[in-house]
Amino acid sequence: MKINLDPMPDRTTEEIQSLVEKQIEKIDTSITAGLRTFLIQPRLETRDWGWSEPIRAFPVWIIAESKRYDYCLLYSDYGFGPANPWGLGFSSYKGFDADYCWYGSLEDAYKDSRLIEEYDEQKK
């Protein structure tokens, strides 16, 4: 998997919201109903890229969060982005996580997340 640690232009909250909405437009509405319950106003954090010496920190956007668990969906142009900019992560963990936690689309990240199970639990 290709990685990007080169400087990228800074993004705004509005740009990230727009990226999220463009991804949602591509997803079947039966899936987006659940996804939308977890979306938040994108929040910028800095997370450590632990596979370099010295360890470097890069911007990561939290775009969705669990209401019950330490779990979130992420977006970043760094690390495994831009090819796989949508990630699964723990809200309390400040690293990028492994390559298998990053996806080419928001849909794939959401489908592989525990958020789907949490949404199903909420409906019961």
Predicted regions and their residues:
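Amphipathic, interaction-prone secondary-structure segments
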Residues: T37-P82
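Polybasic, proline/glycine-rich intrinsically disordered low-complexity segments
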Residues: K26-D28, T32-G34, P82-K124
